[in-house]
Amino acid sequence: MMRDANDFHRQTLVQNVTQLALGPIVARYYDRSMEQAREKGKRWVISTREEMQQAALDVVSEASRKVSIFTHDLEPGIYDSPEFLEIIKRMVLSQTYARIRVLIANPTRAVKNGNNFVSLGRRLNTYIEFRHVREDLRTHGEAFCIADETALVYRLQADRWEGIVDTYEPAVAKLYGKMFDEIWLASEVEMEFRQLGI
C-alpha cells in the first residue's frame, strides 16, 4: 500500500515538473508517452545541483556525434567537472565528425573566473565551439543539454535546478534541437572567446 502511494506521488511529481519544465505543448506529448511502456531510455526529475551534475553526465554519455548546450554562464561545477570533460574529450577524440556546440547567454563570468570547459575548447577548437547568444534572443530563461537529438536534460529556469531528464526522447530532443539551431545561426562567436583563441 505504501509503495503504491509512493509510486503515485512520484508519478504526480514527474507530471508536475514536466508541465513546469517543458511547457504545456511538450508536456502533453510527455503525458501521452508516459502511459506507454518504455522500451528504451529512462526519464526522471531533478531538483538539486548534484542531480543536475549527474544528469549532465548521463545525457552526454548517450552522445556519439553531437552535443548542444544552452547555458547562461557555463554553470560552474556542471559543465567543467573532470568527469564531464573526460566524456567530452573521449567523444571528440574517438569520432572525427563529433561536434560540441555551446550557446552562452552571459559568458563574462565563465571567461573572467576561468572555466575548464573553455580551456578544453581552446585545445580542441576543431570540435568544440562557443557562441554568445544574440542580445535580442537572451529572453530565453531555460537551460538544456541535448545529445544526438535523442537525450536531453531541460530546466525551464536556468537559475533553478528543477528539471527533467530523458535518455531517449527523440521527438522532444529534436524540438529543442531545432530551437537551439535557430539561435545558433543567429548568434556569433563570442569576442572574449575569440581573444582566447577559441
PLM regions: where:
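PLD/PLD-like phosphodiesterase catalytic module centered on the HKD motif
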Residues: M1-S68, D73-I198
